[in-house]
């Protein structure tokens, strides 16, 4: 019985890792043993940062909404509370986009929240 060799399988596996390591500095781009470690760490970073990106964008939207709302003598928390009391369901991404690109409709939202806050106060 002939010996089973893994030449093609190993070559393809090495090629896949070295392709992922393209653009790395030093031996990490062409030495398989180092490249596999660097690629694995890079994939861990990308996995982690895909989750962090969601947090960072939510924080950015909140900052933009807060800055826009403060022009109308409100705080972010008052604005969100007013939206909930007025039964307006607009997500933060859309509100931030309105605040930056469509100020007229954002002002309308602010007025609605002020009215709903005035009713309860």
Swiss-Prot record:
Gene3D superfamilies on file: 6.10.160.10, Ribosomal protein L20 (1.10.1900.20)
GO terms of biological process kind: ribosomal large subunit assembly; translation
GO molecular function: rRNA binding; structural constituent of ribosome
InterPro entries: Ribosomal_bL20, RIBOSOMAL_L20_CS, Ribosomal_protein_bL20_C
Listed Pfam families: Ribosomal_L20
Entry keyword set: Ribonucleoprotein, Ribosomal protein, RNA-binding, rRNA-binding
HAMAP family assigned: Ribosomal_bL20
Role of this protein: Binds directly to 23S ribosomal RNA and is necessary for the in vitro assembly process of the 50S ribosomal subunit. It is not involved in the protein synthesizing functions of that subunit.
Protein name: Large ribosomal subunit protein bL20
Species: Orientia tsutsugamushi (strain Boryong) (Rickettsia tsutsugamushi)
